[in-house]
Amino acid sequence: TLIIKNYQFALYYGASSIKKYDTLYNYALPFLKRKRYKVLQGQNSNFTHKGNFSRYAIDFKMNVGQTVCAIRDGVVIQVKDKFTEGGRDKSYRDKANLIIIYHEDGTFAQYVHLKKDGVLVKKGDSVKKHQPIGYSGNTGMSTQPHLHFAVYKPSENGLVSIPFILNSIPTEKYKKGKYAKNK
């Protein structure tokens, strides 16, 4: 964000004109096969998954250092890998290590709270579905080690989280306390 003489401008990724995207695409779980992780927070939940940006996000409880994988083929457009700390306070909101990947249908996936030096890809890299891209952590606004991830489409007001199908299961089925297993 750039502020000039009381005017504020913001730059967002993607084409805000995107109307259709592949709503039936079956995304892979963001972790290795034969692993299972507990859902800490599902869509539209009280703590941080409210509003347009995070409504359909899912948090998986993952100890620091667990392998995070791409949920779909795409191109890495943003990486943050320098932060070491995390906490509940909003002052940590912009201090999360993350990866954002662009998909061919105009959507994006965001993988957040990665550990410092835990990113295996760089901006501009092409990635394949199931490819390891980083390691889970506890950076940014986070109360415990986990992976926060969501799928987005661009809008005139920035990225908006969208419902999606993950491992043949719609996002609304990923409820707090349930487990997701990657077979």
Predicted regions and their residues:
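Surface-exposed, glycine-biased beta-strand/turn segments
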Residues: 1-96
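Acidic, glycine-rich catalytic/binding loops that coordinate metals and/or anionic ligands
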Residues: 27, 89, 120, 125-128, ...
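A residue-level detector for short acidic-glycine micro-motifs
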Residues: 41, 78, 113-116, 138, ...
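A structural signal for short beta-strand/turn segments enriched in small hydrophobics and glycine
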Residues: 68, 74-76, 121-136
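Flexible, gly/ser-rich surface segments that form the specificity/activation loops bordering the active-site cleft
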Residues: 79-94, 131-147
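OB-fold (S1/OB) nucleic-acid-binding surfaces
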Residues: 94-96, 101-107
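Short histidine-centered loop motifs in beta-beta connectors
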Residues: 106-130
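Histidine-centered catalytic micro-motifs
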Residues: 110-115, 143-152
